[in-house]
């Protein structure tokens, strides 16, 4: 039992560390009663370009946090176990590239949360599943991306006609 737990922690160190970090940040916000929203990405704002490194750590609320926690654990676990040799690089690139995409292509509002990281991890598994001809892996990734899309859709505010 201890050996299995040690193996899981070793294989999933980066996803577990990331999930710990996002929960720690939310805990800090609650305890200190300080919002860290100034660490959001502000598209095309060169003064805040380093927020590419901080925005995935900030979440609006616990629903937002949970909706990113589960996919990171699942997708991170898949990548860590199937792509052991490159998993750390994949996670790091997903983290940084998602920030660059939001900074370069984002709209007019600041962006927070790890959804970009989730989509990047899922996209990596989806594409590599097709390239390696592993349809189960590709379909699992597609399912997680699809389900996460509906979580994202719930965050978007839509004006209703009265």
Region locations from a protein language model:
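A detector for small-residue-rich transmembrane helices and their helix-helix packing motifs
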Residues: 2-162
């Amino acid at each position: 039992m201890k050996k299995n737990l040690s193996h899981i922690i070793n294989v999933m160190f980066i996803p577990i560390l990331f999930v710990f970090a996002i929960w720690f940040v939310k805990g800090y916000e609650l305890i200190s009663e300080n919002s860290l929203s100034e660490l959001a990405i502000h598209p095309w704002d060169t003064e805040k370009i380093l927020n590419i490194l901080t925005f995935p750590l900030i979440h609006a609320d616990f629903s937002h946090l949970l909706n990113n926690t589960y996919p990171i654990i699942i997708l991170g676990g898949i990548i860590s176990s199937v792509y052991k040799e490159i998993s750390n690089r994949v996670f790091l690139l997903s983290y940084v590239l998602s920030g660059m995409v939001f900074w370069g292509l984002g709209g007019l509002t600041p962006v927070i949360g790890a959804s970009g990281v989730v989509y990047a991890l899922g996209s990596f598994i989806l594409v590599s599943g097709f390239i390696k001809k592993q349809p189960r892996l590709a379909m699992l990734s597609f399912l997680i991306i699809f389900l996460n899309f509906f979580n994202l859709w719930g965050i978007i505010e839509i004006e209703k006609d009265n």
